[in-house]
Design a protein with these regions (language model features):
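Helix-loop-helix hairpins and the membrane-proximal interhelical loops
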Residues: 1-46, 172-245
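Residue-level signal for transmembrane alpha-helical positions in Major Facilitator Superfamily
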Residues: 25-26, 151, 227, 269, ...
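Structural signal for hydrophobic packing residues in well-ordered secondary-structure cores
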Residues: 21, 25, 38, 62, ...
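Intrinsically disordered, low-complexity segments enriched in polar/charged residues with Gly/Pro
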Residues: 49, 56-57, 209, 348-349
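Helix-loop-helix junctions within the multi-pass membrane cores of secondary transporters/permeases
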Residues: 2-6, 12-31, 50-131, 243-331
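Alpha-helix initiation/capping motif
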Residues: 9, 91, 167, 209, ...
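Predominant activation on well-ordered alpha-helical scaffold segments within soluble catalytic domains
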Residues: 31-35, 59, 80-84, 140, ...
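Membrane-embedded alpha-helical modules
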Residues: 88-194, 295-390
Length: 390
């Protein structure tokens, strides 16, 4: 405790808050959309946020304290996008079962030390193509909405582009704040009365089906590992730290598993937002930056405890506001994954078919397009690498 007091700094606390704010600013509305797509009621949606806040907050806080470097954890935005894309194919309890299995798999793969070895067999081009395909419709949706809400969408895009140009690190946060301010000028709506109350966890009995395990749990596992944990580890390394890979991945998997029956669909290492807590602006001494990770964890815990208030606030905004924010928030993720998917010329054909199949939304035997896209891509890659006998 004495060291914690000595290492404490206001910039570190602020960095932790910004990391938290970037993590939830837009994707929080996606969580609501994802839960609703599975048929969750208001109490269950509140429980999702309670579970996510406590699982992410406790894991980030404890790991940062134990290893003395900033460990920012978060939920997976592409993961919740996958859940939304699976609308109508699984019920809430099948999805909860898939979340539970995914968490167990992450813990096993993390603690066993086979994380990097396992992922080495799946080319990055294919996983990125799968992600880009899943997310494509969210980017397209914002432009298709222009026919009805032209002024509002153009204003949102202008805010995003200007803030991206001037303040790239905080562009999403600024888009959320300024978007909320201008929204009443374009769309008539009324904020519901906000009541401050503690969230109540709701147990959702897991149900298991092969279709949900293959169509949701498996793609979610791949997404969590490839789009969050891999870049999250790389981000920590890039600032000169030596991350405890097995422990970080393993314990986030444990937190995921424990809180899955209450609505926790993912707990992973933060990737992009983690840079705020790792940067030298937090503290000149790298050994004291872990305070930012602890601070971020505390804010997530507070979010979880007051989840009911957060949900009632977010659900007061019109649907087009959520659609616009979701699309804009995913621009960077879509472009990043498209670039990586088609960077390797030799794997481009397989990546293209993975991308198109994943974007199609096709379903076979109740299994979603993300799984089939990845399987198709692996098949094409193997086919093209075979040396035909003369």
């Amino acid at each position: 405790m004495q060291r914690l007091i000595q290492d404490f700094s206001i910039p570190a606390v602020f960095a932790g808050f910004i990391t938290f704010l970037i993590g939830i600013s837009v994707s929080a509305v996606l969580v609501i959309q994802g839960a609703q797509s599975l048929g969750a009621n208001t109490a269950q949606i509140s429980s999702w946020f309670w579970a996510l806040g406590l699982a992410i907050g406790l894991s980030g806080l404890i790991l940062s304290w134990k290893y003395k470097y900033p460990v920012a954890t978060a939920w997976s935005t592409p993961g919740i996008a996958l859940i939304i894309a699976s609308t109508g194919h699984y019920d809430l309890y099948e999805a909860i079962g898939a979340f539970l299995v995914c968490g167990i798999a992450i813990a096993i793969v993390g603690f066993s030390g086979i994380f990097l070895k396992l992922l080495a067999h799946i080319p990055q081009s294919l996983t990125c193509a799968m992600l880009a395909g899943i997310l494509l419709k969210f980017g397209i949706q914002i432009f298709s909405s222009m026919q009805t809400y032209l002024g509002f969408i153009l204003s949102m895009l202008l805010i995003y582009l200007v803030s991206k140009r001037l303040f790239p690190r905080y562009s999403i946060v600024l888009t959320v704040i300024l978007g909320a301010i201008i929204c009443p000028f374009f769309i008539e709506f009324q904020l519901h009365s906000i009541t401050w109350s503690l969230a109540q966890p709701v147990w959702m009995q897991p149900a298991f089906s092969w279709s949900a395990l293959l169509g949701l749990a498996l793609p979610l596992f791949v997404i969590n590992m490839t789009s969050q944990n891999l870049p999250g580890i790389a981000m920590i390394k890039s600032y000169g730290y030596q991350p405890h890979v097995n422990q970080l991945v393993g314990w986030t998997g444990v937190a995921h598993t424990i809180f899955a029956p209450f609505g926790c669909f993912s707990v992973n290492l933060a990737a992009i937002s983690a840079a705020v807590s790792l940067d030298d602006q937090v503290h000149p001494d790298p050994a004291k930056r872990y305070i930012a990770g602890i601070s971020c964890g505390v804010f997530y815990i507070l979010m979880g405890l007051f989840a009911a208030t957060l949900v009632s606030l977010l659900m007061s905004f019109p649907q087009i506001f959520i659609v616009a924010l979701a699309g804009i928030a995913l621009f960077a993720t879509i472009s990043h994954n498209v670039a990586l998917a088609f960077a390797n010329v030799e794997e481009r054909e397989a990546a293209l078919l993975t991308f198109l199949c994943s974007a199609s939304g096709v379903q076979f035997w109740g299994i979603g397009s993300a799984f089939w896209g990845l399987i198709l891509g692996i098949f094409v890659l193997i086919l093209f690498r075979l040396k035909l006998k003369k």
